[in-house]
């Protein structure tokens, strides 16, 4: 019996391999139209829904990439104080932060002023906001404020009181002053 143990081990090791081979060969059996289940459809007939799923997946990946880039910029600038007209780490204003973010993270040149930035891209309703959209607010009778939407009703911006921060658009101050959103990043 001692001499037969190595042979028995080889046989026992081979049984799972044989079982897997048999199961896998069943997967490669010919599937003709007559032996398909009624609820099974050919892939070609679902091209449009598959394309829609692929488009949704690609949009999700792009949104994750856009948010990641914006958050990288935020991490680099978090807490930098506000300075009207500023565009450096010694102090930056809202439009300067937006301009630098889009230049450094997306290679996109936006104008320097909030007034000019609000004319860029296309108008987007609040219910259709996407990560990377510009969100614009009224501040006083002629003042304007701009930030970058990052999802979940949040935006990153250079605030006059706290410097570069993330704020909620649902905070009473911002909710009351929300004006519009602009889409400047293409998703193609």
UniProtKB/Swiss-Prot annotation:
A lipid is attached at residue 27 (N-palmitoyl cysteine). GO terms for molecular function: cysteine-type peptidase activity; endopeptidase activity; muramoyltetrapeptide carboxypeptidase activity. Residues 64-185 form the NlpC/P60 domain. Disruption phenotype: Unable to grow on nutrient agar at 42 degrees Celsius. A triple mepS-mepH-mepM mutant is inviable, whereas a double mepS-mepM will grow on a nutrient-poor medium but not on a rich medium, suggesting the 3 endopeptidases are functionally redundant in vivo. Depletion experiments of the double or triple mutants lead to cell lysis, as well as significantly decreased incorporation of mDAP into peptidoglycan sacculi and increased amounts of the enzyme's substrate (Tetra-Tetra-anhydro muropeptide). It is a lipid-anchor. It is found in: Cell outer membrane. Pathway: Cell wall biogenesis; cell wall polysaccharide biosynthesis. A lipid is attached at residue 27 (S-diacylglycerol cysteine). It is an enzyme of class 3 (hydrolase). The active site is at 94 (nucleophile), 145 (proton acceptor), 157. InterPro entries: Murein_DD/LD_carboxypeptidase (IPR052062), NLP_P60_dom (IPR000064), Papain-like_cys_pep_sf (IPR038765). It catalyses: N-acetyl-D-glucosaminyl-N-acetylmuramoyl-L-alanyl-meso-2,6-diaminoheptanedioyl-D-alanine + H2O = N-acetyl-D-glucosaminyl-N-acetylmuramoyl-L-alanyl-meso-2,6-diaminoheptanedioate + D-alanine. Changing residue 94 to A: Loss of DD-endopeptidase activity, no complementation of double mepS-mepM deletion mutants. Residues 1-26 form the signal peptide. It holds the Pfam family NLPC_P60. Its EC number is 3.4.-.-, 3.4.17.13. GO terms for biological process: capsule polysaccharide biosynthetic process; cell wall organization; peptidoglycan metabolic process; peptidoglycan turnover; proteolysis. GO terms for cellular component: cell outer membrane. Keywords: Cell outer membrane, Cell wall biogenesis/degradation, Hydrolase, Lipoprotein, Membrane, Palmitate, Protease, Signal, Thiol protease. NCBIfam families: PRK10838.1. A murein DD-endopeptidase with specificity for D-Ala-meso-diaminopimelic acid (mDAP) cross-links. Its role is probably to cleave D-Ala-mDAP cross-links to allow insertion of new glycans and thus cell wall expansion. Functionally redundant with MepM and MepH. Also has weak LD-carboxypeptidase activity on L-mDAP-D-Ala peptide bonds. Partially suppresses a prc disruption mutant. Belongs to the peptidase C40 family. Monomer. PANTHER family: MUREIN DD-ENDOPEPTIDASE MEPS/MUREIN LD-CARBOXYPEPTIDASE (PTHR47360), MUREIN DD-ENDOPEPTIDASE MEPS_MUREIN LD-CARBOXYPEPTIDASE (PTHR47360:SF3). This is Murein DD-endopeptidase MepS/Murein LD-carboxypeptidase. It comes from Escherichia coli (strain K12). The gene is mepS.
